[in-house]
């Protein structure tokens, strides 16, 4: 019996285009100004040091740090200090009203239905927990954070690593067989399934394609997901 949902965001609850065409360009445009204006912020200081560790250059200049961060955005690298910095930048954007999150109508309706029925819902995204909460705090359906019992990012592990899903199951207190994982990424689906999760792959028409002979269920919309039939 499914007692918990663990869902991805990008390409699952939210269009990839929102992340790629709205959030990423916004952070790229603002990153240099934000870092230079917040050098006294302990969080920013730690991010700068983490970038230096990531590139194995402890004496890297601020300009080198910023250029690496910009390159990682362009290359869509899932690197923790970048994701944490993007979260801080997006926070300013959401608070100023320049950014608003977007959630698919079918995702909103199903998430609310599951929440109302007592199923616990958790988020697992490569974006930082801060960025996840920000996206859902200001959406086309208002603040949706009340729907979620917890959030996970790459601090718990890589999304394509079986052990990440083992850790999450322990953390939320459900056995893998009681959890349904939703994602558009086939490698993440396979990793979660190998940890014993129930899995369904989202194939949004504009974001992904059906994979022939894929060993797990694929759907185009949350409307096709019936918990009792998983």
From Swiss-Prot:
Cofactor mode of binding and number, as noted: Binds 1 Mg(2+) ion per subunit.
Catalytic activity: 5-methylsulfanyl-2,3-dioxopentyl phosphate + H2O = 1,2-dihydroxy-5-(methylsulfanyl)pent-1-en-3-one + phosphate
Gene3D superfamilies: 1.10.720.60, HAD superfamily/HAD-like
SUPFAM superfamilies: HAD-like (SSF56784)
GO MF annotation terms: 2,3-diketo-5-methylthiopentyl-1-phosphate enolase activity; 2-hydroxy-3-keto-5-methylthiopentenyl-1-phosphate phosphatase activity; acireductone synthase activity; magnesium ion binding
A biological process from GO: L-methionine salvage from methylthioadenosine
Pathway given in the UniProt record: Amino-acid biosynthesis; L-methionine biosynthesis via salvage pathway; L-methionine from S-methyl-5-thio-alpha-D-ribose 1-phosphate: step 3/6; Amino-acid biosynthesis; L-methionine biosynthesis via salvage pathway; L-methionine from S-methyl-5-thio-alpha-D-ribose 1-phosphate: step 4/6
Signal sequence coordinates: none
Subunit structure of this chain's protein: Monomer.
NCBIfam families: enolase-ppase (TIGR01691), HAD-SF-IA-v1 (TIGR01549)
UniProt-recorded name of the protein: Enolase-phosphatase E1
């Amino acid at each position: 019996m499914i007692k918990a949902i663990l869902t991805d965001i990008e390409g699952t609850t939210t269009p990839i285009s929102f992340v790629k065409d709205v959030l990423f360009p916004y952070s790229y445009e603002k990153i240099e100004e934000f870092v230079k204006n917040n050098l006294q912020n302990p969080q920013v200081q730690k991010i700068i040091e983490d970038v230096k560790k990531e590139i194995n250059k402890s004496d890297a200049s601020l300009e080198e740090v910023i250029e690496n961060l910009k390159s990682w955005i362009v290359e869509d690298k899932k690197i923790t200090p970048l994701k944490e910095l993007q979260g801080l930048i997006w926070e300013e954007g959401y608070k100023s009203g320049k950014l608003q999150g977007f959630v698919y109508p079918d995702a909103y309706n199903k998430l609310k239905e599951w929440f109302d029925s007592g199923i616990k819902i958790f988020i697992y995204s490569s974006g930082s927990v801060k960025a996840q909460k920000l996206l859902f705090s200001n959406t086309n359906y208002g603040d949706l954070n009340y729907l979620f019992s917890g959030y996970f990012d790459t601090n718990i592990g890589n999304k394509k690593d079986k052990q990440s899903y083992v850790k999450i199951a322990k953390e939320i207190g459900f056995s893998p067989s009681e959890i349904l994982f939703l994602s558009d990424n086939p490698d993440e689906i396979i990793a979660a399934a190998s940890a014993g999760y129930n899995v369904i792959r989202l194939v949004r028409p504009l974001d992904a394609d059906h994979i022939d002979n894929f060993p797990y269920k694929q759907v185009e919309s949350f409307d096709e997901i019936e918990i009792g039939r998983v």
